């Protein structure tokens, strides 16, 4: 007999197939037999992780005994996986309707859950796309959400090597990360970051190297990573046939001292984790311009990983994901751009650019190219079976553009309202946009993730007098 969670999951599939949006309150009247509302949260969490539904907002409950509490607003994502998952028969055999790469992501998510790590197919697909599309990936979110664990599991799943760099609060220059000249030994002493890069350069195999900077904003990255950020601007074909960046400028040392050659290469993935609290620093525009910032904000306190008695479980084979991670374009000229993508992205960013200058700086080629790369890779590797094109663009805007947006002036709040009207495609004046209006339109939005974040920022501005994407 199916468990209560599985039975409620069938109800959620039915609602996702029949309605544009629904809340957990809509599930309650459909419960029969021994099913109780206590099982709804765990079933909803599993449905979201499986890609059956996506949470697009939170509203106050309409049930008298729960009056005032917030409940999620859900809808079926516009992806092949979501459509199939709404069908009970197809849900048992997703490989019949999705690409092999999408199936590998589904299997990898199941493997992570057996290893004790909960995440959704959307989160996993998004992180893998961002690893391939940009030099830097920054994972943000509350402490304890598994930011560091996610990269460790991904590295293990694709046969990669993880280099763990623990950032210290007293790091004030590149000598702390890249190394320094020792007056005592009269030689250059590599730092933890340069050591990892040197080791990855010596690896002639096709193994991936993941360099994880844990809590990277305990110190100011623009101080201890300035040379790395600058070197990553230019790429060329190295002597070993591998794409590599310009040489990273090391701290000063006497001319007679032999310094190691340090550069980034295509087999290296730079990942930083950040917490936002009173002990950390805000990230500068120089860092945010060059990174994708993915927020692991979904915390399912009702979800538990399945029991696993096999302690020697191996990760599933993932040739499609390995191919994705090897495909790292460094220029839009290397992309096979899908039809209509440049027009869609260009028109949207042009409209947002009207307000971006006031919110954190204009949207430039770097941000546009990041969105084009994300969407192109998603379609080339058929990850659009999990994330539709509009979902990829939505995730890209939230990850590559919004992190710089902040303000406290009347002009900034007005610009924020204008950006919300643009994202929601509302033909109204910015002054007429309120948090309530924005949230009421999110269920119909083409880019709900961006709209939800902007609505939260407007609510913050209303309550506190300032707003920030963080």
Task: Report each predicted region and the residues it spans.
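Short alpha-helical segments that sit at the start of domains
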Residues: 1-14
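Short acidic, hydrophobic short linear motifs in intrinsically disordered regions
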Residues: 20-30
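Short amphipathic alpha-helical interaction segments
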Residues: 34-46
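A short, conserved structural fragment
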Residues: 49-58
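Short, cationic-aromatic polyanion-contact patches
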Residues: 59-82
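AAA+ P-loop NTPase catalytic core and its hallmark functional loops
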Residues: 86-323
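Alpha-helical lid/collar subdomain of P-loop NTPases
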Residues: 102, 310-470
């Amino acid at each position: 007999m199916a468990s209560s969670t599985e039975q409620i999951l069938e109800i959620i599939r039915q609602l996702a197939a029949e309605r544009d949006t629904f809340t957990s309150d809509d599930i309650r009247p459909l419960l029969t037999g021994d099913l109780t509302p206590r099982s709804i949260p765990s079933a909803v969490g599993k449905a979201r992780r499986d890609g059956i539904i996506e949470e697009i907002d939170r509203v106050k409950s309409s049930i008298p005994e729960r009056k005032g509490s917030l409940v999620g607003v859900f809808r079926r994502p516009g992806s092949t996986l979501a459509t199939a998952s709404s069908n009970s028969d197809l849900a048992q055999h997703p490989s019949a309707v999705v690409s092999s790469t999408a199936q590998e992501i589904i299997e990898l998510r199941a493997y992570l859950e057996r290893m004790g790590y909960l995440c959704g197919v959307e989160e996993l697909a998004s992180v893998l796309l961002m690893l391939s599309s940009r030099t830097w990936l920054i994972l943000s979110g509350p402490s304890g959400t598994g930011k560091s664990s996610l990269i460790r599991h991904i590295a293990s799943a694709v046969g990669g090597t993880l280099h763990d760099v623990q950032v210290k609060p007293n790091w004030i220059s590149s000598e702390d990360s890249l190394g320094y000249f020792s007056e005592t030994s009269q030689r250059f002493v590599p730092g933890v970051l340069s050591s990892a890069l040197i080791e990855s350069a010596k690896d002639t195999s096709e193994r991936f190297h993941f360099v994880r900077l844990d809590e990277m904003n305990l110190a100011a990255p623009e101080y201890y990573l300035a040379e790395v950020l600058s070197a990553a601007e230019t790429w060329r074909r190295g002597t070993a046939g591998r794409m590599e960046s310009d040489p990273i400028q090391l701290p000063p040392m006497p001319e007679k001292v032999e310094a190691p050659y340090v550069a980034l290469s295509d087999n290296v993935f730079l990942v930083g984790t950040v917490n936002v609290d009173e002990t950390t620093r805000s990230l500068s525009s120089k860092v945010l311009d060059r990174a994708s910032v993915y927020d692991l904000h979904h915390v399912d306190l009702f979800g538990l990983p399945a029991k696993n008695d096999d302690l020697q479980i191996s990760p599933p084979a993932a040739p499609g994901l390995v191919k994705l991670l090897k495909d790292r374009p460094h220029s839009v000229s290397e992309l096979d751009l899908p039809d209509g993508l440049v027009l869609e992205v260009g028109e949207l960013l042009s409209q947002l650019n009207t307000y971006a200058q006031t919110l954190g700086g204009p949207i430039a080629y770097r941000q546009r190219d990041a969105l084009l790369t994300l969407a192109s890779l998603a379609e080339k590797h058929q990850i659009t079976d999990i994330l539709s094109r509009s979902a990829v663009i939505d995730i890209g805007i939230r990850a590559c553009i919004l992190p710089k947006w902040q303000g406290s002036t009347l002009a900034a709040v007005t610009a924020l309202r204008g950006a919300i009207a643009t994202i929601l495609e509302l033909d109204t004046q910015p002054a007429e946009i309120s948090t309530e209006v924005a949230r009421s339109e999110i269920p119909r939005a083409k880019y709900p993730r961006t709209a939800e974040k902007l609505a939260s920022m407007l609510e913050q501005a209303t309550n506190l007098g300032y707003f920030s994407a963080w």
